[in-house]
Amino acid sequence: MTTTITFFGLSCVPVFHRYADNDRIAILLRTPEGKPVATATVNQPDFNLEPNQVLIKDYAENEGILAALANAGIIEDTGKTVPVGHAQARLCRLLVQPTLH
């Protein structure tokens, strides 16, 4: 069964990939037809992550994406943040076993 979440009023499907430079999990949101909506994660290579952790970009155009993913049971917010440029990404635990595309 495919998980569907609502983000900015759009029905979205989370799609999991890996970042090429360090093999970390990336979460992208797509429409059910496959059109891109948002990239939920950011990659901060200088910060050590556990294999089940991701950094969520919940600011600017992605504001609200943390709540959407958490409400769907995909991630859990640890309450910690990591500096990313001039902003802060949220450190989260994956609650699902990602199927990579």
Each model region followed by its residue ranges:
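Short, compact, well-ordered microdomains
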Residues: D58-H101
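Generic local-structure boundary detector
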Residues: F16, I27, A38-A40, P51-Q53, ...
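Ser/Thr/Pro-rich, acidic low-complexity intrinsically disordered regulatory segments
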Residues: M1-A26, K35-A38, N43-P45, Q97-L100
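Acidic, aromatic-enriched beta-alpha/helix-loop junctions
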Residues: R30-I74
